[in-house]
Amino acid sequence: RAMALASPLSPAAWLDDIFASKAAIRGQVIRRKARDIEKFVGRREFERELKRRGFQAVENAGQVIIFCNREPIRRIV
């Protein structure tokens, strides 16, 4: 897995940084570009971290919405 030159953070530090955001700490949702996740940390490692934290995520149109809590997700429409 090659690390992109665009991020000064290691993959672990990048993950720590997004999950240290106010929204994540409060159990809210955060959004990231799918390509940034793949570029900075890798899909497999990202999914492993979500599972470790008990979080869920959905992807649509190149965006990943991360639910920073363990509540069920209910699709409305």
What function would you assign to each model-found segment?
Residues L5-L9, P72-V77:
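Long, compositionally biased
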Residues R35-V41:
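Short, surface-exposed ligand-recognition loops at beta-strand->loop->(often short) alpha-helix junctions
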Residues I25-R26, I30-K33, R75-I76:
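A short, structure-level motif marking secondary-structure boundaries and short turns
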Residues R44-I76:
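Short, compact, well-ordered microdomains
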Residues I18, F40, E49:
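Residues that form generic nucleotide/phosphate-binding pockets
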Residues R1, R31-K33, E45:
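General structural signal for secondary-structure boundaries
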